Amino acid sequence: MTKPTPPSSVADIRKSFLDFFASKGHTVVPSSPLVPGNDPTLMFTNSGMVQFKDVFLGTDKRPYVRATSVQACLRAGGKHNDLENVGYTARHHTFFEMLGNWSFGDYFKRDSLKWAWELLTEVYGLPKERLLATVYAEDDEAYDIWTKEIGLPPERVIRIGDNKGGRYKSDNFWMMADTGPCGPCSEIFYDHGPHIPGGPPGSPDEDGDRFIEIWNNVFMQFDMAEDGSVTPLPAPCVDTGMGLERLAAILQHVHSNYEIDLFAALIQAAARETGTADLANPSLKVIADHIRATAFLVSDGVIPSNEGRGYVQRRIVRRAIRHGYKLGRKTPFFHSLVKDLVAQMGDAYPKLREQEQRITEVLKAEEERFFETLANGMDLLDSALDIQLASKALQNKTLRWFASEGREEKLVSFKDDVQVAEAVLISDELRSTEYMQRLKETVPGLNEVKTLHSVIRDWSGLTLPGDLAFKLHDTYGFPLDLTNDVCRERGVTVDEDGFKAAMDRQKAQARAAGKFKMDKALEYGGEANRFSGYDGLTESAKIVAIYVDGTSAQALEAGQNGVVVLDNTPFYAESGGQVGDQGVIHAGGARFAVDDTLKIRADVYGHHGRLESGTLRVGDAVQAEVDAALRAATMRNHSVTHIMHKALREVLGSHVQQKGSLVNAERTRFDFAHNAPVTDAQIREIERRVNEEILANTPTGARVMDIESAQKTGAMMLFGEKYGETVRVLDIGTSRELCGGTHVARTGDIGLFKVVGESGVAAGVRRIEAVTGAGALAYLQQLEDTVAKAAGALRAPAAEITGRIGQALEQVKALEREVAALKGKLASSQGDELAGQAVDVKGLKVLAATLPGADAKTLRDTMDKLKDKLKSAAIVLAAVDGAKVQIAAGVTPDAMAKVKAGELVNFVASQVGGKGGGKPDMAMAGGTDAAALPAALASVAAWVGERA
């Protein structure tokens, strides 16, 4: 019987892997999103086991004990970051696919290793003599399975001990964390052959490319304690992972992952879009890799931004764009590759095909944004490197250069002119041509040199200043790794410490300029206060500290502003976007008006305000009362923010993530990740969904639990947010989030919800403002008043004002047409009158005059009629509106060789505080000094005479 042909295409390899393990009783589990839903501390899904982490920890249980999947993974940013290596090696990627199979307390080492061998040798047809394995030095069980049961020769099974400096610190011993599930692993390697440098694993040359790891089988059989000791787990598990791209390279008989069929297609597409003929160009590899990463990120809700996952996305997109720019593509192109990616991977990942248009739009918007600054940023970077080159050359006192004829290499010594030349050359942000002109003036004999790059070719040892790298980041949108990329290509290092220092300075300035919402400057070393504001608005308390002008005090007198700290308080301190409570603190005749409540530290609240009467002293017993009306309004707006957040994700997509919020008694302001304006129809749908939840009048509920339990509830968590061991899970309608704020008891307490504003606040960030309850009523009443006033002005019922406005607009258009016709007649008559004012200058008619009340169109129309009438002329017409001046210049075709309209209009405009430009026959300008216009017009004839 003929043996079936082994699968080789990426698509076939994927399918055959899943089919194989399905035949072994495994449940095929879809790839989980790149954004981990169960771990806010992990930036991206970086392995197949991430979605099963809770199963291994024992906090989750699945309806199956065997699983297999092909997992989309990303390693860019955070601990696992391959970004800087992509494009420079054969196997580094930002995005990759991990083939895996898992056992949750079911089968163990024997089945895992035997099935791996069966799949590799019988299904994929890999030569057995090309395979070898590693095991942990003490794992005799795995060693015996390989040598005695599978039949791998002992010399091809390598024991790896504790080679990382400690007990169980080994390439072949896997740990989920410092404590918890762990165990030995067995890695399978493929030998590419002796023609490729490198030694087997465990040897001094193991980092070579000859022996490549393709599959890792992890056997979680121990639980590690804090003291480093291990005890057997009651139900050992298996976790395996094999890189799809590496396996495909082997099966397709190529050495580099970038030569496999999937990448070959993407590289062809990148070459098409950039106009590149050389398919081996490393920049094409970068672009092909990055389109996978960025498209999958968008499909999982990550859009480019300036923080967290969004910033990693931005870095990857802009790195790809820069490589396209390097290949000569100066306009957006990257988004055009999405269709090619969908053709390659859309069948395996249907969400790519479903979201193709949105992915394309997001990437195109980011490209257009970056292309606005890319060219200027590259010019600045090139100029900065030129400065470094010139400085280095001058320090060496010798320049290596080429004569323009014959390319003969010569040396020029600066001798005694070094200091002079250095002073001339080292100036900020000049261009290479300017350096060379100065250099030619300073050093005799360099007249034939054209560019600084032809003068100096040795970039080694140069360092780009950190403050300049920060300027590229801050002003031109260059991520640091992009600047590093450019510099590395030229052998230049970047002063990253200087970059960080500049970044820290800017952050410090931003903090100083803003209202810092935690009074860390107050020196309070006492105990934490107890917050009772979830349960009530009044509290009997004792004053434990008083601050006046930032300094600790024992008493506060009438008329003084200060900060009061209580042992217990019902006042909510500003946090999580919700403003601090207002109210009063009183005792006897003393009354302290609380204007704001801020945190002194996480568990201590400071009550800011003014003592209106009496005296308050440390130790006094007081009554604390929150302003009930303000608190109720704030709670309505905070609670509706949660419901709105969920509605936004339902209407706009799961990519919507909170980027900031402000909740007070007047309104809620919510900033979120989204790349396009929210349409009127979408806003209506969001309003409908939110008000539907309000009308349901369901109870809200808050539960305090540990962070792991909260993760299991599916509560929304914000990546990068620092959560404590104990968190508060809030249920409002169908929304579930972690929140420490104050909220309504039932959704019906919110009242009416109405969106009052939608706008963009930053690249990829939109803002919605909304009102509730009495605020919503006031907003609608104000709109009614506006409609009533408009109806009165139009003398029409409110229901008919849109029709009446349409009629009025048609009347306006008709009047505008009449005015335009009259202006045309006026221009014709004025042209006849002005033609007689032209003077003859060397055979050319010259006219400079004003047209009172003319607009730009009238100036142009009159100009055309005058040119027809005068035949051979140079004309300047101007009009004045207050202090502003409009100027038009025109030159007939026969005179353009001597007089250009653009030069003429600038000559006049420069005298009236303005500038302008245009074509040789017609140009426009503006000015701000009407008083200088008569003299400017009087000078036109002489100016033309010098050129005629």
Swiss-Prot record:
A single Pfam family, by name? tRNA_SAD
What is the main EC category here?
ligase
Where does it reside? Cytoplasm
Cofactor(s) annotated in UniProt: Zn(2+)
Tell whether Glycoprotein is among the UniProt keywords: no
Q: Which UniProt keywords apply?
A: Aminoacyl-tRNA synthetase, ATP-binding, Cytoplasm, Ligase, Metal-binding, Nucleotide-binding, Protein biosynthesis, RNA-binding, tRNA-binding, Zinc
- A single MF term (Gene Ontology): ATP binding
EC id: 6.1.1.7
Reaction catalysed by this enzyme: tRNA(Ala) + L-alanine + ATP = L-alanyl-tRNA(Ala) + AMP + diphosphate
Details of cofactor binding: Binds 1 zinc ion per subunit.
* Annotated Gene Ontology cellular component terms: cytosol
Residues that coordinate or bind Zn(2+): H638, H642, C739, H743
For biological process, the GO terms are:
alanyl-tRNA aminoacylation; negative regulation of DNA-templated transcription
The family annotation for this protein states: Belongs to the class-II aminoacyl-tRNA synthetase family.
Anything noted about its domains? Answer: Consists of three domains; the N-terminal catalytic domain, the editing domain and the C-terminal C-Ala domain. The editing domain removes incorrectly charged amino acids, while the C-Ala domain, along with tRNA(Ala), serves as a bridge to cooperatively bring together the editing and aminoacylation centers thus stimulating deacylation of misacylated tRNAs.
The role this protein plays is: Catalyzes the attachment of alanine to tRNA(Ala) in a two-step reaction: alanine is first activated by ATP to form Ala-AMP and then transferred to the acceptor end of tRNA(Ala). Also edits incorrectly charged Ser-tRNA(Ala) and Gly-tRNA(Ala) via its editing domain.
Record's protein name: Alanine--tRNA ligase
